[in-house]
């Protein structure tokens, strides 16, 4: 069976940490693919942007 695990963080290092923890427990032969995305949105009434780093790990269960 194919399954997915979705990760979503505001900081790329947090996403990296979470994914590495998950991948440590996953047998390499079960990994199918990893999809990665970054979204940036302006913060209300400020010049800063809010970032959303996300990834989806596709694997065999």
Place the predicted regions along the sequence by residue.
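A short, charged, amphipathic alpha-helix used as a generic interaction element across diverse proteins
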Residues: 15-23, 27
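Short, mixed-charge low-complexity intrinsically disordered segments
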Residues: 28-36, 40
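Short proline/glycine-enriched turn/loop segments at secondary-structure junctions
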Residues: 42-48
